[in-house]
Amino acid sequence: MNEKLKEIVTISEPRSPISEAYRTLRTNLDFAGLAKTLKTLVVTSAGVNEGKSTTLANLAVVTAQAGRKVILVDADLRRPRLHQIFGLSNEQGLTTIMMDDNALAAPPLQETGVESLWLLPSGPLPPNPAELMASRRMEEVIAALVERADQVFFDTPPVVAVTDAAVLATKVDGVLLVISAGKTRREYARTAVQRLQQINARLVGAVLTNVQMGAGFRGYY
């Protein structure tokens, strides 16, 4: 096993309460998608360092473990983290296929070491992330990825800090908001929800991370 994968709790401790919480999250999202299937999902946060990338990595793992083909896309073109979490290269990725038709036909997806889970890292960081998210090309990229997987998950920058997440949220089936207990200021969380509502994004739920549940429970929830 890739040593980095041991840092992903749903892989290293699949029977832990934390891993069970991620499976519960997966199930809740399935129910949220009864009216409209969540083929594409954006995961964002109100502010920085709130655990969105870790949350998304674990959600992707448990979704793949349920027998679905999952593509995890690092659309945080400012501070990409997913390639580090999985211990993979970031030389090519989302920005590569945004610029290259040949790459779009054969996306540089990387095997994560988890069956049925692939990562499309951010690739080289561009000077204009928000413009790329808003482009027609991004819609073509999403369509191409959906053809290759049962579900496509996107990691994005915090929705309050920059416009990238809000722009991408208008192009997907749903948005999951990550909030850190004891860190996210209430007004930031409120602003994040308001921004998503203003653009008519489909907010399917929120995840509270870094909750202290006592000595018998190590977890994010």
Locate predicted features.
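Hydrophobic micro-sites
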Residues: 1-8, 190-221
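Acidic-aromatic/histidine active-site loop/patch
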Residues: 1-28, 210
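Phosphate-binding loop that captures ATP/GTP phosphates
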Residues: 11, 63-121, 142, 184
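Walker A/P-loop phosphate-binding motif and the immediately C-terminal alpha-helix
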Residues: 15-77, 81-86
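Phosphate-binding/switch loop-helix module in NTP-utilizing enzymes
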Residues: 104, 122-162
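Inter-motif core of Ras-like GTPase G domains
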Residues: 147-148, 161-182
